[in-house]
A protein has these predicted regions:
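Sec-dependent signal peptide cleavage junction
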Residues: 30-48
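N-terminal Lys/Arg-rich, disordered targeting/topogenic segments
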Residues: 1-23
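A surface/extracellular/periplasmic glyco- and lipid-processing/surface-interacting theme
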Residues: 27, 47-102, 109-353
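Hydrophobic membrane-insertion alpha-helices, especially the h-region
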Residues: 18-35
């Protein structure tokens, strides 16, 4: 009887050991999975950083002046095209934004926004547009880069400004051979161009690239913020023009949403930017068409977002031909290389971030 009792006791001990072993095994398994997931995420971030700066290791590489990306020596100061691109719902999806070096988004009239997208002529883009009419402030921004302005007509003030200030432009009204009209789109949302056509204009007229005044750029080699500003929302007071930028920590960039959907260009490429600037500017309505006058020189408030955080600062443009620069706590902002997207808003705009 005592032997049976001892066997039962020993059997209970083994059950306890067994259950404890099982518990320990699953606990270790859970921690291992957690560790591997965390390690994988960090590895992805590091790989992304390596990919973004790997060109730096090649011989004779230098930063492209328009966006800070490393390119072969001799390609840093190519001619730049500043293309006025439609953003009406009937024009979407637009072509070219996913490959742009720099984009300004600003109201054209009546809370309807339009893009001024900058492209270095070393890019091979088969289709860019729809191309629309220009506004005076677009002319000012194009001049900052000595860019060739690409547009289809414009407001009276803008066309007069182009003529008076002798801004180099390719107006579709007088240069139709460098554009085409798509049969599947209705006017005025059907005018497109390509970098091949624009470069043929450049070559035909024996143009020379002028020096670009560059911003400062850095390599992405620091710790990335994870909690400060994952979403930036700009509400242009129209459901069709509500913009959100959501921070992607894996790639250290901002994914664009338009009307609450991921914004993709006509080639199904997501619109992603390395730097987001919200630039508050003095604005007034000047005519019955609700066109605007935007003061592009002087200084004002700005919100500068990169590496997962937004910082309040100021923008300054000391003259009509100088480059707009951005400052936080008195120091000029050093941007990540890649696409910078400038959201131009009225002074009283409220930005959620």
């Amino acid at each position: 009887m005592k032997k049976i009792f001892k066997k039962l006791i020993n059997l209970g001990k083994w059950k306890i050991v067994f259950y404890f072993s099982v518990l320990l095994f699953f606990t270790c398994l859970i921690f291992s999975i957690f560790y591997l997931v965390n390690f994988y995420n960090k590895l992805e971030v590091n790989n992304q950083k390596i990919n973004q700066v790997e060109n730096k290791k090649c011989e004779n590489c230098t930063r492209r002046l328009i966006d800070g990306v490393y390119v072969s020596e001799g390609q840093e100061n190519n001619i730049v095209y500043a293309v006025v691109i439609d953003n009406q719902p009937d024009a979407r999806p637009v072509f070219g934004l996913g490959e742009a070096n720099l984009v300004y988004e600003a109201e054209a009239e009546g809370r309807i926004t339009r893009y001024l997208a900058f492209f270095s002529n070393d890019l091979d883009l088969k289709k860019v547009g729809p191309v629309r009419s220009v506004r005076p402030y677009f002319v000012d921004w194009a001049k900052e880069f000595n860019a060739i302005l690409v547009h289809c007509g414009g407001s009276p003030e803008a066309l007069a400004k182009i003529k008076k200030e002798k801004v180099l432009s390719i107006n579709e009204f007088f240069n139709g051979e460098y554009y085409w009209r798509a049969s599947n789109m209705s006017a005025p949302h059907n005018i497109y161009t390509s970098t091949e056509k624009l470069t043929s204009y450049f070559n035909k007229n024996n143009l020379v690239a002028n020096q670009i005044m560059s911003w400062q750029y850095k390599d992405e080699d620091k710790e990335i913020a994870t909690t400060s500003s994952p979403i930036i929302k700009i509400d242009f007071k129209d459901m069709d023009f509500v913009v959100q930028w959501k921070y992607d920590i894996i790639n250290n960039e901002y994914l664009r949403y338009l009307s609450e959907k991921i914004d993709k260009d006509g080639n199904d490429k997501e619109i992603r930017a390395k730097n987001i600037i919200i630039q508050f500017m003095e604005t007034e309505v000047i005519d019955e068409e609700l066109r605007l006058k935007i003061k592009t020189h002087g200084q004002g408030k700005a919100l500068i977002c990169l590496d997962g955080e937004c910082r309040e600062g100021v923008w300054k443009k000391i003259s009509g031909t100088s480059r707009t620069r951005y400052y936080v706590n008195g120091e000029e902002v050093i941007f990540n290389a890649g696409l910078t997207w400038v959201e131009v808003v009225r002074e009283n705009f409220k930005i959620n971030y």
